[in-house]
Amino acid sequence: MPKSLLFALASLPLMAVELKVDHATVAGKDVRAMQRALQAAGLACEYGGPHSNHATEMALTSFPDGSYLEQIAIQPNADPAAVAAHEWHKQLQSDGGPCAWAVRPADLGAEVTRLRAASIQVSEPKKNGRKRPDGVQIEWEAAQVGSGNGNFFPFLIHDFTPRERRAYPSGKPTTTDFTGVSKVVIAVKDLDASIAQFRRAYGFPAPERQDDPEFGAKLAWFRGTPVVLATPLSPQSWLEARIREFGETPCAFILGAARVMDVHKPAAWFGRHVVWADSAKLGWHLGFETK
């Protein structure tokens, strides 16, 4: 067996790491316009307030499993320099839609150490926060994994204030029509190379694969995780154009549906039905998954 393969196998975690979505983020110019579009697609939203970075504000849709869908946008009277310096400035300034995702490990420090031991780059945790419209202050820290901030690997988040204040501004899930963020679909240039990166970072077994011509992608899903990798089937596809514009980032999010959805022709992804919202109206790709 080649030494390089032995080294790669030795660097894998002994057991696969459990990844549970803390939140998934959609970016745009105007948070209220984003809220209206989501509400038209059947999702209620709550305004969450401005961030302390002088660049962005957010709204969210939270779910019974604790995850939430963040709508992040440029705040009124934002500092142009702060917006330009923001990790997601391209998506913010061009209504780019899905841009990042986060997980909340039980022990952030231990997870940073584990990832670095697997030769995965992790930044030092950085403190952030925002004030809710009701005046409640929320504080957390986040660490960037890999070269992007939640673009490929999820960033890590740890709360200093009770997590419920961040996820449930009204004290309960925004909606019970959907169970949570079940899949994060990440657009990638090289499917095999991306699979290898996730397996090295998290110890996942080999993924299941399928093609979806209508979505325009070759797909790979790590069973039991939210991670779906998608590479374009055609150089002329919307997915190829998206990768050229934004790089390897989330291109779609899929929510678990709490009820059977009555549709004529759902997509079939890995044994489950996926119903897609109208991306032309919403401005990005959002799916609803049923058994």
Feature roles, as predicted:
Residues 8-9, 290:
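Generic detector of N-terminal low-structure segments
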Residues 9-16:
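Hydrophobic h-region of N-terminal signal peptides that target proteins for export
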Residues 17-21, 26-45, 63-209, 213-291:
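Glyoxalase I/VOC metalloenzyme domain signal
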Residues 1-8:
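Sec-dependent signal peptide recognition
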Residues 58-62:
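Charged, often glycine-rich, active-site loop that binds/positions anionic groups
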